[in-house]
UniProtKB/Swiss-Prot annotation:
One of its GO terms (molecular function) is quinone binding. It comes from the Bacteria. PANTHER family: NADH DEHYDROGENASE [UBIQUINONE] IRON-SULFUR PROTEIN 3, MITOCHONDRIAL (PTHR10884:SF14), NADH DEHYDROGENASE UBIQUINONE IRON-SULFUR PROTEIN 3 (PTHR10884). It comes from Legionella pneumophila subsp. pneumophila (strain Philadelphia 1 / ATCC 33152 / DSM 7513). GO terms for cellular component: plasma membrane. SUPFAM superfamilies: Nqo5-like. NDH-1 is composed of 14 different subunits. Subunits NuoB, C, D, E, F, and G constitute the peripheral sector of the complex. It is found in: Cell inner membrane. It is a peripheral membrane protein. This is NADH-quinone oxidoreductase subunit C. NDH-1 shuttles electrons from NADH, via FMN and iron-sulfur (Fe-S) centers, to quinones in the respiratory chain. The immediate electron acceptor for the enzyme in this species is believed to be ubiquinone. Couples the redox reaction to proton translocation (for every two electrons transferred, four hydrogen ions are translocated across the cytoplasmic membrane), and thus conserves the redox energy in a proton gradient. Belongs to the complex I 30 kDa subunit family.
Length: 227
């Protein structure tokens, strides 16, 4: 039995009532849970001997607003630069019948030497998730970053302030509906002799079409999905 098979067996036995989905692909195990079950699940994952996830190595937000929309599709290899699109696409490549936003946690057990991805989807109308700062101190800046870039609130965080954007920044720049050129630009006004903020005068346009292609590293090696 591999480490992942052992982990999956224990997850199904101990957390079946708290997780909504469990998948294994490309040597990585992922579970999904509801927002209200996040803290019970995380406590079990940290404290149970068979899991022993003592480190939170990453936490991020995801916006699925335009997920599956694409301009071109190609089977060309991904390791040798971009290629021309071969066929104009009109329909979605993938459909996600879940809320727009998700929070993803990556856990590591230094004792058991295994990893786990935990994902939960959050309703756009109620972007509030319990903080896990009291379980892993590394969550502090991770949660601040997710708040800054996506607008996801973490209930119970000790200091939920923006981390990367400027003072007075409006909006959340990693959201898919945030314009690539931004909302405002900063420049020095020689007449006023000071730095001012003004609306951007760049016209938004697509210079590189959105491409969805299979990763050639896994083509012909589908058996590795369940390792």
């Amino acid at each position: 039995m591999t480490k992942n098979e052992y982990l999956i067996e224990k997850l199904q036995a101990d957390l079946a009532n708290h997780i909504t989905e469990l998948t294994s692909a490309y040597g990585e195990v992922t579970i999904e849970c509801e927002v209200q079950n996040l803290l019970p699940v995380m406590i079990e994952l940290r404290d149970r001997e068979e899991f022993s996830f003592d480190q939170l190595i990453d936490l991020c937000g995801v916006d699925y607003l335009h997920y599956g929309d694409y301009d071109w599709e190609t089977e060309s290899a991904t390791e040798h630069g971009f290629s021309r699109g071969v066929e104009r696409q009109e329909a979605k490549a993938y459909a996600v019948n879940k809320p727009r936003f998700a929070v993803v946690y990556h856990l590591l057990s230094t004792k058991k030497n295994h990893r786990l991805r935990v994902k939960l989807f959050v309703e756009e109308s109620h972007l509030i998730v319990p903080s896990v700062h009291h379980l892993w101190k590394s969550a502090n800046w991770f949660e601040r970053e997710a708040y800054d870039l996506y607008g996801i609130l973490f209930d119970g965080h000790p200091d939920l302030r923006r981390l990367l954007t400027d003072y007075g920044f409006i909006g959340h720049p990693f959201r898919k509906d945030f314009p690539l050129s931004g909302e405002v630009e900063m420049r020095y006004d020689a007449k006023l002799q000071k730095v001012i903020y003004a609306p951007v005068d760049i016209v938004p346009r697509i210079v590189v079409p959105k491409v969805i292609r299979n990763d050639n590293r896994y083509i012909g090696n589908e058996g590795s999905k369940n390792d």
